[in-house]
């Protein structure tokens, strides 16, 4: 029996536009951005940033170094935000309804530029019992340690938990730990939850 639901953020709650982000970074002179960026798990210094091993200032300095141009922190942050579109209102409404019956968690590979803005813009703390963020716990999906951290901290059982993510590798790890899973498709509504639950 499902008692808990764990949502990924990017690609599940928030629609993504990686190509807009890539284009914006290239416009700043960061030509090889595609070596670092992915819809699921970043690479290199961007991975360090999502693991909380690099400050916002260090992230911006690294982008400046790789771009070879004098660009402001704001220009860099604006380019980085091109990755995120919005959270459809119907998804938040569904989560709010689900919270009446289930414990609701967010497990996300994210960073200290994106998450605080999304938290404030959408009042996410009204919809989730707790957030598990890669930049806070210093692990990124699909590393099993981020899942184990959540299990231990929340006091939940994997077999009683539905994990929803758009990353196949993340789903594979969750399944190996005993979670029930759903691989989300791009721009999928959450109506499937009515059938699963």
Describe the function of each predicted region.
Residues 2-89, 93, 111-114, 197:
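N-terminal helical cap/lid subdomain that shapes the substrate entry/recognition surface
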Residues 8-11, 52, 98, 106, ...:
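Generic structural signal for small/hydrophobic residues in well-ordered secondary structure
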Residues 15, 105-109, 165:
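Short beta-strand segments
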Residues 100-101, 177:
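Conserved dinucleotide-binding and phosphotransfer motif residues
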């Amino acid at each position: 029996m499902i008692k808990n639901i764990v949502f990924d953020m990017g690609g599940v709650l928030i629609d993504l536009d990686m190509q807009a982000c890539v284009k914006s970074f290239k416009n700043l002179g960061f030509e090889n951005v595609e070596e670092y960026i992915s819809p699921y798990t970043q690479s290199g210094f961007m991975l360090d940033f999502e693991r909380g091993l690099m400050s916002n200032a260090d992230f911006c300095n690294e982008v400046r170094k790789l771009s070879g141009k004098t660009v402001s922190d704001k220009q860099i942050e604006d380019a980085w935000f091109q990755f995120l579109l919005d959270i459809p209102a119907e998804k938040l409404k569904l989560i709010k309804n689900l919270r009446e019956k289930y414990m609701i968690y967010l497990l996300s590979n994210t960073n200290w530029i994106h998450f605080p803005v999304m938290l404030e813009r959408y009042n996410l703390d009204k919809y989730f019992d707790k957030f598990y963020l890669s930049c806070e716990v210093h692990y990124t999906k699909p590393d099993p340690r981020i899942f184990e951290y959540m299990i231990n901290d929340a006091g939940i059982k994997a077999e009683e938990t539905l994990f929803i993510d758009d990353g196949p590798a993340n789903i594979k790890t969750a399944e190996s730990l005993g979670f029930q899973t759903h691989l989300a498709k791009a721009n999928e509504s959450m109506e499937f939850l009515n059938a699963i639950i």
